Amino acid sequence: MTHCELMQVGDIQAVVGDASRDGVGGTQYCGVWSLTTKRRVFNAFGNSYAGLIPGDIRGKAPRLEVRSDSCCALVRKADDTYPVDVCATYELVAPHYIDHTLRFTDRRDVRGPGCSFREVSWCCYMNCPEDSRINFLVGGKWFSYISPEHGVGSNIAPAYLPDRALEVWPKVEGRRSFHWDRIRERFDQPFYYGLLGDHALMLLFDTPRWLRFFCSPSGGGGSLRARETCPAWDFEWVIPASDYKVGREYALRVRLVYKPFVSQDDVLAEYEKAVAELGFETV
């Protein structure tokens, strides 16, 4: 059985793997095991972790399928332990893109206890960035942010949705999900970026009406830098009750860009390019 696949296109090299590695958190880190470029050979993601990890297959033993020299998928069929059909594709596109799509169909209602909404989340565990913050637009200006501690001020909602359209988290006894703590600031547009050395890692999203960002300063574990931790730059789509249906196939898309940082205007240009090339929905 093949557990991982190395793909190289243009300037970018990626290793996509299943959950077979027994890492710091056990066998759960499926997704992009390694991400480098010809100009930056240091892995963007934590070496015992991964990036673009879909929560719907995390720790659920997905199967790796190689589709071509530049595309592979992580696939899992619904069963009694998790009744969701899932296919996560990772396609490298020259010179510096990973186009990622998650297709899934719930065979039973898998919404959390007390939740009217369906959460579909991803984690990206970053490798020792000097600046742990993600950057996004707030009120037309760039805003840099990382939560002060794990589980505090972790969730960022979109500015283009009214309060009444946002999910209401249920009251729970004991510890609740770490990303259920929202900050006042809201993002204007469905993208963010972070810096890794002289490179920018950008995440550009489709289906913006369901999108949320969330983050942690320590989700990626210990850093190579003394007394520092590695952040998690995460995101999710929240499907409201009015749009949720058992048996319906959903497709959620994100473009990852990994290239030398040029300017914030270049980030905007990459988003506009994704909209034009991939037909992403805009706000």
PLM segments and residue spans:
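Acidic-aromatic substrate-binding/catalytic surfaces of carbohydrate-active enzymes
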Residues: M1-D69
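Beta-strand-rich recognition/accessory modules
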Residues: H3-M7, E167-V283
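Primarily extracytoplasmic ectodomains and periplasmic/lumenal surface modules that are beta-strand-rich
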Residues: I12-A14, S20-G26, H96-I98, R107-G112, ...
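Short, surface-exposed beta-strand/loop "edge" segments at domain boundaries and coil↔beta transitions
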Residues: D22-G25, L35-F45, D79-V86, V110-P113, ...
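Extended, loop-rich substrate-binding clefts of extracytoplasmic carbohydrate-active enzymes
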Residues: N47-I98, F104-D109, P113-S116
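Extracellular structured ligand-interaction cores
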Residues: G59-A61, D85-T89, P95-T101, F117-C123, ...
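Acidic (Asp/Glu-rich), glycine- and aromatic
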Residues: Y97-S154, Q264
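Low-complexity, serine/threonine/proline-enriched polar segments
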Residues: L137-R186
